[in-house]
């Protein structure tokens, strides 16, 4: 089961939650869902150079809150915040309501599956050897602290007549373990020989608490820095 389904969808409400967090009646649901798709597509095109990883959309009462996770937030913010204000006004045209825009920096893009997949896809479009691109991504992820990573590329690799699939893995990637914090992403490289699909799985550890917000909370704590308090068992051992 875990080998076939999307790892993110399998772990929803276990250690991860949705990227669209709102509730609507049946008559409004379709329109709001279409708005979300348009907002995400627009941000991906406008902030292509910023390395956008995720776009989280929340809709409190008659408002819209958009949070962009990006590797280079300065590209979105611009000089003295001019570009982010322009982007906010353009996004407000999609919703027709008050819109709040937040930018969150991705401190370790080597551990973000979406950014890794897009990086490999861009290298393939520049005709870099797929084996070199895969191996470089795996080495960078393991160096930055990943417990395991798997990269899968499929298509007419190297311009071959027959499409095939190649994959490379290092460490462990437990797809059946629900408490495993596994980041997954898919990207596509457009080459003269056709489309090459790139899939990336990154295993970052285990989240023991049963909390859908646990993954987002862990990301926030990683950006704020380590807690000044040590592990409880270390304090108990020192006391003894």
Swiss-Prot record:
CDD domains: KH-II_30S_S3
InterPro entries assigned: KH_dom, KH_dom-like_a/b, KH_dom_type_2, KH_sf_prok-type, Ribosomal_S3_C_sf, Ribosomal_uS3_bac-typ, Ribosomal_uS3_C, Ribosomal_uS3_CS
SMART domains: KH (SM00322)
Keywords, comma-separated and alphabetical: Ribonucleoprotein, Ribosomal protein, RNA-binding, rRNA-binding
Ranges of compositional bias, category Basic and acidic residues: 212-221, 231-240
Region of interest (Disordered), ranges: 212-240
BP term (GO), one: translation
GO molecular-function terms, A-Z: mRNA binding; rRNA binding; structural constituent of ribosome
Domain of life, source organism: Bacteria
Domain KH type-2: 39-107
Family that this chain belongs to: Belongs to the universal ribosomal protein uS3 family.
Assembly information from the UniProt record: Part of the 30S ribosomal subunit. Forms a tight complex with proteins S10 and S14.
Function: Binds the lower part of the 30S subunit head. Binds mRNA in the 70S ribosome, positioning it for translation.
Protein name: Small ribosomal subunit protein uS3
Provenance organism: Paracoccus denitrificans (strain Pd 1222)
Gene that this sequence comes from: rpsC
